[in-house]
Amino acid sequence: DTEHRVSLAGLSQPRVEPEVVFGFARAPRAGMTLPQLADCLEWVAHGFEIVHTHFEGWRFAAPDCLADFALHGRLFVGPRVPVARFADLALDTANLTVTLHRDGQPVETGHASIVLDGPLNALRLWVDGMAEHTPGWPIRAADLVTTGTITDAWPMSAGQRWHTTLGDPRLHGLTLATVG
């Protein structure tokens, strides 16, 4: 589904982040190359993560944020596209552009390469970090992972309509209509 109504109730200072989302077909392991990691994936999709924090003005240090279990509020994942439709998943997702619109007006165009040199590379770094720092928490088939925002995180309020247009026809834009 590409259109969603989302309640902002219970969220503090919510912001919207357009991201790339990957779904695993099988468990990856640390130290994989990008092509090896791509072979562990079943699908790729565009998603919206809504993040929030009670730290006033979004001013905090990363350790404070992590200790507070802050940021993630909601996740909306668009249509899942089989990775087999991408000749070079690392390059194709790194070259992705996303234009974020609020109430019909473009607010920012982002390039996925800003996400640690591309979403698949960001995923590789995350897989390696998970193996090193949380070896008892394995990544399994059917898990999904978001890879980081492609634009700034934009403040949201009730009554807005957020929409994305993507520079790759294989991936679908999403629309969020916000309510209180």
Please place each PLM-identified region on the residue numbering.
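Short, charged beta-turn/beta-strand-edge "cap" motif at the junction between a beta-strand
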Residues: I150-W154, D168-L171
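Short, aromatic- and glycine-rich surface loops/edge beta-strands on solvent-exposed regions
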Residues: W162-T165
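Catalytic-core "active-site belt" of small-molecule-metabolizing enzymes
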Residues: D1-L123, V127, A131-H133, S157, ...
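Thr-Gly-centered strand-to-loop micro-motif
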Residues: T109-G110, A141, T147
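Short strand-turn-strand beta-turns centered on an Asx-Gly dipeptide
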Residues: R102-D103, T147, G167
